[in-house]
Amino acid sequence: MATTDSSTDSADEGPSPKSSYCDTTETKSSFLEPPLPATICGLANLLEIPLDDCLIPCNFCGNFLTHLEVCEFDQKKLSLIWKGHCVFACCRVCCTATATYEFNEFYESTVEGREIESVTGKSIFNVDVRCYTCMRFLDSIEKLDICGRKLPFHKVRGSWKGICRLCKHFQ
């Protein structure tokens, strides 16, 4: 009976020295941990596995990304989402749905072609533009094509959006 009283007393007094040591160790180890990778290639390199073996779930639908979606994710320069020590990405369907949602909910303004340079005060080559359909970064040729055809650039959630060469053919 005395053992039950002492275990109750020690629980009331707070954490035992052993558990506080573990807490301190966990805190110290978090300072020593390398930063979590932002790309799937970076994750594969960290884990020392081939890219083909990376199975990453979509943050929105929960399906695992296909190999093609894994490659597209890094090519689009999107960042992995870390929740604790679990990693998530975004599949092609959810990426398109997210882009559409952002455009519909957070649209700010539209400029035509070369007007983007006067609005931003930057050369078209220095303005980051993502596709408003698939979220790919546009390259210089795609941005110049939009300028030359006097197509719109849209400001959405503080970032510029245009249409990439791939999505342009589906409209």
Swiss-Prot record:
InterPro entries: E6, E6_sf. It is found in: Host cytoplasm; Host nucleus. Gene3D superfamilies: E6 early regulatory protein. Residues 1-28 are annotated as: Disordered. SUPFAM superfamilies: E6 C-terminal domain-like. Residues 17-28 have a biased composition (Polar residues). One of its GO terms (biological process) is DNA-templated transcription. Keywords: Activator, DNA-binding, Early protein, Host cytoplasm, Host nucleus, Host-virus interaction, Inhibition of host innate immune response by virus, Metal-binding, Modulation of host cell apoptosis by virus, Transcription, Transcription regulation, Viral immunoevasion, Zinc, Zinc-finger. GO terms for cellular component: host cell cytoplasm; host cell nucleus. A zinc finger (unnamed) spans 58-94, 131-167. One of its GO terms (molecular function) is DNA binding. The keyword DNA-binding applies. It comes from the Viruses. The keyword Isomerase does not apply. Plays a major role in the induction and maintenance of cellular transformation. E6 associates with host UBE3A/E6-AP ubiquitin-protein ligase and modulates its activity. Protects host keratinocytes from apoptosis by mediating the degradation of host BAK1. May also inhibit host immune response. Forms homodimers. Interacts with ubiquitin-protein ligase UBE3A/E6-AP; this interaction stimulates UBE3A ubiquitin activity. Interacts with host BAK1. Belongs to the papillomaviridae E6 protein family. This is Protein E6. It comes from Human papillomavirus 14. The gene is E6.
